[in-house]
Amino acid sequence: SIGHIRPYLTNEATKTLVNSLVTSRLDYCNAMLTGVPNTLVNKLQRTQNTAACIITRTSRYSHNTPVLKELHWLPLKYRIQYKTLTFTYKALHDQTTDYIRDMIKVYKPNRALRSQDSLSLVVPNVRTVSFGERSFVHAAPSLWNALPHHIRSSETLSTFKKLLKTHFFLVCYSHII
């Protein structure tokens, strides 16, 4: 366990170890966790919280939000949304495979409306909340349409990622001074 060898590691070595062993596992295919019940996401969040406490040498019983903010880490719920929205951006800009691109439909009204330039996506109707709303086909447009327009209209992927992470960071940590 990293916690047992932590006294012998520098801060940089600990960050590298945690990033390679813990964070990489949390981020691997986490877009598949879209719509998973909060009880399951919270279990994974506890793993991220423990890793953050090991890096910063804080008590595991202390409040985790300031620790995550100090490390510039998004909570797992927002990391999942970040990955889903990144796939969505890539699909809209022809930077991903055809089968993902085919899942996303751009909203085009039949007549002239103010919303025609909003870069919105069509959210398909679903029959079941448990499976339908969890699917990428439904979740991606819902998350995309909730973003501010200046983020959706980003010119490059790197700009989009930067603005999206800043947006999520403000949403998560704006209540902390």
Question: PLM features: residue spans?
Answer:
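Hydrophobic/basic alpha-helical segments
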Residues: 1-177
